[in-house]
C-alpha cells in the first residue's frame, strides 16, 4: 500500500494508506451508514463526484461480483474505510474490492479514523477535498482543490446517463430460487424511464411490478413522450435518481414542466423527486451533510407506519411545496419531506429509495402504487 495524502477545504490535512487506483482526485466527502452493500454503493451513479466514508469499520470482507452492480461501472471518486480487508470470503465473489477499484480507476483510502471524518462532516457539513498518492505537499494540494470546480457546478448527468434508448427486461434477484434474476412478467402497462443515473435495481423493481420499461437519455424531448402517451404507446414516465445539484439541470426542468402541463402520469425517485419540485416552481436546497445510508426511519403519513429506508441525497425539497402537494412521507431524523402527491396532475414522488440495494425493502409497495396510477 502507498501513502495517500488528503486535504479538505476546511484546512484539515491527513495521511493514510491507499488501495485501489493510484491518482490525484478531487471530490466531495460524504458518509454512509450502511452495514453492507459497498459494491452497490460504489456503482450507484448518484455518487458521481463524491468520496464515500463508510462508517462500518470492516470493508471488503465479501469481495465483489458482477451481478450486484447497480450500473456498468463504479462512479464514486473514492472511498474511505477504517480497515480494508484483503482476504474476502463469499461463494458469489469474483474478485477483491482492491481489484475492482483498480479496474474502475477508483481510489481506496484505509487505515484512517472514519469516525473522526464522519463527525467532521456531521458537524461542519459535506465539503470538497483532494486525495493523492502522488503529491504530499499540503500547499500544492490546497492549490489543486481551489482550482477545481465544486460539485454544485458540475453536470454529472451528462456522464452517467445512457446515450441511446434501450429496453430493460430483468426482474428482481431471486435468492431463494436459484440465485438469478427473474424473467420479466407480462407487463400490464408501459413507461419511459428518463435516465439521470438510474440504478439497475430500480429498473428491476419496476419490471417486477409488471411494468414494461424503455430507458431513454436525459436529453429527452417532452413532445415525443406526450405523443407516445396520447397514442397509448406509453402509460407514464418515471424520473430516475442521479448525481449532483438538480438546480443545474435547466433543460431537463423545462422538459419536465411540459410533461406536467400535459398531465402525464409521473413518478420520481430521489433526483427525479427534486426535479418535479423545481419544475413546479419550488427550488431545492442543500442539506448540511445529506442522507446516506440504509437505516433512515420514514413515516408513511397515510398509514401512520414507520418504514426503515435506504437514502442517498444531499438536496431536499422546500417545506412550502405543501401549497401544491400533499406530504405522503416524512423523515423522522430531521422532519424533512420524503414523499409528495401533487394536486394538479397524476404525479407522485419519494426522496428515499424504495428499491434499496443495499437496504431494507419496506417501501417496495411504492412501485405497485405506480402501476395502479398508470394502468388504463
Which residues does each PLM region occupy?
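Proline-centered loop/turn at the N-terminus of a beta-strand
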Residues: 107, 190, 265-267, 283, ...
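Active-site glycine-centered loops adjacent to acidic/histidine catalytic or metal-binding residues
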Residues: 113, 270, 313, 353
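Short amphipathic alpha-helix with an adjacent loop that forms part of the alpha/beta core around
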Residues: 222-232
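Catalytic beta-strand/loop cores that center a nucleophilic Ser/Cys/Thr
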Residues: 304-345
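Active-site-proximal beta-strand elements of phosphoester/diester hydrolases
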Residues: 190-195, 309-310, 348-352
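Cysteine-nucleophile active-site neighborhood
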Residues: 234-308, 359-374
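RNA-binding accessory domains that recognize and position tRNA/RNA substrates
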Residues: 1-208, 214-219, 246, 357, ...
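A glycine-centered loop/beta-turn motif at secondary-structure junctions
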Residues: 339-376
Amino acid at each position: 500500500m502507498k501513502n495517500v495524502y488528503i486535504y479538505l477545504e476546511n484546512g484539515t490535512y491527513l495521511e493514510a494508506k491507499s488501495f485501489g487506483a493510484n491518482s490525484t482526485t478531487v471530490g466531495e466527502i460524504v458518509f454512509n451508514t450502511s452495514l453492507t452493500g459497498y459494491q452497490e454503493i460504489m456503482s450507484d451513479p448518484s455518487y458521481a463526484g463524491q468520496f464515500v466514508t463508510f462508517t462500518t469499520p470492516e470493508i471488503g470482507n465479501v469481495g465483489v461480483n458482477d451481478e450486484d452492480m447497480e450500473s456498468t461501472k463504479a462512479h464514486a471518486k473514492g472511498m474511505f474505510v477504517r480497515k480494508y480487508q484483503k482476504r474476502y470470503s463469499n461463494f458469489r465473489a469474483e474478485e477483491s474490492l482492491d481489484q475492482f477499484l483498480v479496474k474502475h480507476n477508483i481510489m481506496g483510502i484505509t487505515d484512517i479514523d472514519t469516525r473522526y471524518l464522519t463527525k467532521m462532516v456531521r458537524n461542519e457539513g459535506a465539503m470538497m477535498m483532494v486525495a493523492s498518492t502522488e503529491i504530499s505537499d499540503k500547499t500544492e494540494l490546497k492549490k489543486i482543490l481551489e482550482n477545481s470546480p465544486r460539485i454544485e457546478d458540475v453536470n454529472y448527468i451528462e456522464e452517467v446517463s445512457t446515450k441511446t434508448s434501450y429496453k430493460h427486461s430483468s426482474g428482481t434477484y431471486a435468492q431463494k430460487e436459484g440465485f438469478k434474476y427473474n424473467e420479466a412478467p407480462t407487463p400490464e402497462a408501459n413507461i419511459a424511464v428518463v435516465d439521470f443515473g438510474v440504478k439497475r435495481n430500480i429498473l428491476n423493481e419496476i419490471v417486477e411490478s409488471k411494468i414494461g420499461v424503455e430507458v431513454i437519455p436525459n436529453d429527452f424531448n417532452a413532445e415525443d413522450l406526450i405523443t407516445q402517451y396520447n397514442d397509448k404507446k406509453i402509460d407514464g414516465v418515471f424520473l430516475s435518481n442521479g448525481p449532483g445539484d438538480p438546480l443545474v439541470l435547466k433543460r431537463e426542468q423545462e422538459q419536465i414542466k411540459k410533461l406536467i402541463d400535459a398531465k402525464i402520469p409521473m413518478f420520481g425517485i430521489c433526483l427525479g423527486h427534486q426535479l418535479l419540485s423545481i419544475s413546479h416552481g419550488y427550488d431545492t436546497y442543500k442539506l448540511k451533510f445529506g442522507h446516506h445510508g440504509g437505516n433512515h426511519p420514514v413515516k408513511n403519513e397515510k398509514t401512520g407506519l414507520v418504514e426503515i429506508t435506504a437514502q442517498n441525497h444531499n438536496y431536499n425539497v422546500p417545506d412550502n411545496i405543501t401549497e401544491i402537494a400533499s406530504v405522503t412521507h416524512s423523515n423522522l431524523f430531521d422532519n424533512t419531506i420524503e414523499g409528495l402527491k401533487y394536486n394538479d396532475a397524476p404525479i407522485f414522488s419519494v426522496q428515499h429509495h424504495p428499491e434499496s440495494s443495499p437496504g431494507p425493502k419496506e417501501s417496495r409497495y411504492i412501485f405497485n402504487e405506480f402501476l395502479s396510477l398508470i394502468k388504463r
